[in-house]
Amino acid sequence: MNTAPAPARPAQLLALDWGTSSLRGALLDAQGAVLDERAFARGILTVPPGGFAEVFDASFGDWARTGVPLCLISGMAGSKQGWAEAPYCPCPAGFADLAGQLRWIEHSSLAIPVAIVPGLRCESELQADGLPPVPDVMRGEEVQIFGAIRHTGRTNGIFVLPGTHSKWAEVQDGRVRQFQTFMTGEFFALLSQHSLLARSILADAPFDPAAFAQGVARARSGAGLLHNAFGTRTLSLFERMAAPALASYLSGLVIGEELRARHLQPGAELVLVGSSTLVQRYSHALSQHGARIQALGAEATWAGLHALAQHIDHHDHT
């Protein structure tokens, strides 16, 4: 007896992560499972003025015309340089707050309703000596945080998103209450490629866990990155560290400096969201501080957009 194949699950959401240098998309079913994925080197910096709708149609137009009811876009597509500015949503913010501040795109060529997710903004809490607060922002990471909340079921705690600009977010009752940004990845790139240290560092050297751990430990000494970074040069100068290990040592220094600034307590529980390479390094560093880690990867973005879609009444925008 022949059994008919199961019908294909219909897509319920076209989810896009449109960043500075890349464009990723996924078709999700009603449960948030990924039906198909695509990626292009078409970040917002590659799109000419007025060209976003054309790039969208060339990249995902066939998906948009299959009957999927909604497209949600996170990332830099909502910046001033993007498709349409989606102003930052103030913290504390949860799913409903983001859903209420979506930027809906009006364009005759679009086959389905398209909305851009706003980023988040907050004000620094610690004002020493009466200094005014300093604003902080994120755009794209908020979706990863809410995806991690949905994926882990944790509605309270600290969520860490390593990257060029790492984010540490405090989540309370399922809402982002406060966060801090650290320019860790950017500082590593500047020091390793455009400073005195670039003469010593081998950019393509393999990861050295021992050298990385030594850098994290040195950062904990409290001397500060401005002093410790110069040690990368002198360790090479006096041949106390092999050249292939220097990049890992410097990586440990800058990540360790980020952790030192957070004053982590032993046993701290953190949710870590990011690429496998960065999650591995931060896990190594955080273990030296006695932290306990729950890690997630790229699936957090799709989980966040799917969860956000459940809070949207998009029929008013069709």
Task: List where the protein language model places each region.
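Phosphate/pyrophosphate-binding loops at sites that engage ATP/ADP/AMP, CoA/4′-phosphopantetheine
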Residues: 58-70, 259-267
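Glycine-rich phosphate-binding/hydrolytic loop that grips phosphoryl groups
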Residues: 294-318
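Short beta-strand-loop/turn "lid" adjacent to the catalytic site in phosphate-handling enzymes
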Residues: 63-135, 173
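Glycine-rich phosphate-binding loop plus the immediately following alpha-helix
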Residues: 47, 121-218
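Glycine-rich phosphate-binding loops at beta-strand->alpha-helix junctions
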Residues: 22, 267-285
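Short glycine-aspartate micro-motif
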Residues: 13-17, 70-74, 157-161, 271
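Short glycine-rich, Thr/Ser-proximal phosphate-binding strand/loop in the N-terminal lobe
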Residues: 12-51
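Adenine-nucleotide phosphate-binding core of ATP-dependent small-molecule kinases
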Residues: 218-259
